[in-house]
Amino acid sequence: KGSYKEILNGFKLTKKIYGNNNANCLCVVDINHNPLEVYQHFKEIEANDVHLLFPDNTHDTNTINKGQLFDWLKVIFDLWYEDKDVQKPKIRPFIDFIGLLLGELNYGNEMYGKRQNKTLVIETNGNIETVDTLKICGNGFTNTNLNIFENELDDIYVENELARKYYNSHFELCKKCTMCPLEEICGGGFLGHRYSKAKGFDNTSIYCNDLAKLICYIQNKVYDNLPKDLQDKIEKLHYEDIKEFIES
């Protein structure tokens, strides 16, 4: 049984109690759903902020072909970017990538950019762990021997290698990422999406091509709408050049 009705009721209740500024949604991208219908739905429920999340997979579990995620996101980006409705939702990662491309480094988060990841999880038994999305890497992958009743939160960064890796995940990148022209924007993507049993986190993201294509596409759209004097100060990105580097 789906939980859509319960979620929608909870969303409406949140709006009623806390106001429209807190009417925010997380949405894992499903490329089998019509992106036009998805965008229209978020407008219909008057969502204030929508965060489109990439499906959580690793190099060992991913089934999405290169380009499929971009093709889906491109449709929504075009709808959103051309939408003149001032009440349209703010959609991540679009606003984040635009901010990063314009030099606003504060737009980074655990998915992209060049900020440190400071989120921890306290399990129901009090255990201190890194974010639960890293459990996609394997059973018990985020387990620690640390507990809030016996430890300080910062202890995890001393005693747990995974926590340190996650904290610095946009700085500890594979060689390919460190040489990429988009490294400052992409930041290597989400840590879990780089994982493989064979090489650990020493990989590019499973969504590397899609991220590169999306970043270039967004930059080109924004570039084309800038005044000529600003265009002269900015180098337009070309996906084919990035692709050649990625696949070399």
Walk through the language-model features, giving the residues of each:
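Short, small/polar residue-rich loop motifs at catalytic or cofactor-binding pockets
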Residues: Y112-Q116
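C-terminal accessory region of radical SAM enzymes
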Residues: L69-L101, T133-T178
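Short, solvent-exposed loop/turn segments at secondary-structure junctions
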Residues: D30-N32, N57-H59, D96-G99, N127, ...
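Radical SAM/AdoMet-radical enzyme domain recognition
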Residues: K1-P55
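Long, K/E/R/D-enriched contiguous segments that form extended
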Residues: L36-G108
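Radical SAM enzyme core and accessory elements
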Residues: N125-N127, I136-N139, I148, F171-S248
